[in-house]
Amino acid sequence: MNNSVTLQASASNSQLQRARALPMPSRDAMLQRDLSVQQFWDTHRGLLRDAWREWEEQSQSDLPEINETCLDQHLREAVADAWLDPSKEAAVRALWHEEVPGVYSCQFFDPEKIASLRNYFDSAADAGIPLRPPYGIALNRGGAMLDVRSEGYLAAPGFQAFYQQLLDTYMRPIARLLFPEVFGYDTQTFGFSIHYQADTDASLRPHTDASAATLNINMNLPDEAFTGSEVDFINTDSGQVKRTVFKPGVAMIHRGSVPHAAQPITSGSRANLVLWLYGDRMQIPRFTDEERLVDAKHRWTVPTEISDDFAPF
């Protein structure tokens, strides 16, 4: 190996080692939005990005493969057909079942492939690189920020490619299909993982999301049972509450304006992947519009707008 290659490898390894040596901000400091927390993430953003790249390169042979084959075959095939011929999008629509007004469910991931996704997240959590947990309404100890707009996000290039594919190929056209008014308010993305554990994470009070559309996917393994942690969706017109339980690999997609709440988890653990879409500078539709006409071929496109740096939390 020549000297330049040796120096490059040494510098790269040093980045990973330096990232692992960083002291994470305390839980209290994060919850209190202490200025030092923001300074920590801003100061080390480049270092952490490089460390994740190096970690992925070093761990490549041990990391599970995550790609489109992790998705449910029926959904994958219907979406592929719609991208080739948008007039076939009805087959995608037929896979989504309305649970309550404005809330739809579908088998999103293949339950037998969830283990690969979970193993990847577990490997990332054990990487020793500072990873920012979600702390919007509450701090979730086992979760991670996933989008490049978020500080402390999971910056491994292979994961980022998969994450972007979920948003561009699947979530955005599906949201446009189910919620016509979302079109044009879906140029920006946001995502995080959460992991609720009994006796650790409290319930999540009723709230709405700062999104045009939210996709929430159950990442539990088929034999990974839990009790409690049901999600309540609130019909603002009738006041009725629909309590739902996610099965492994099932996704719920809804407008961000739909109020919902998570009940306390009483045993076991629950893992979820949450993805948001919204417009530039965090704009969201003011009203629902079931009758808005959008040509199918426009639904199955990827926005050309540049990603901004606005983040909900």
What are these regions (language model features)?
Residues 1-101, 297-313:
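Fe(II)/2-oxoglutarate
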Residues 1-14, 169-171, 175-179, 190:
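Charged interaction patches that mediate protein-protein contacts
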Residues 60-73, 107-125, 164-168, 205, ...:
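Short charge-dense sequence patches
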Residues 83-181:
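Non-heme Fe(II)/2-oxoglutarate
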Residues 146-158, 198-208, 246, 303-307:
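Short, charged low-complexity intrinsically disordered segments located at boundaries
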Residues 172-297:
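Catalytic core of non-heme Fe(II) oxygenases with the double-stranded beta-helix
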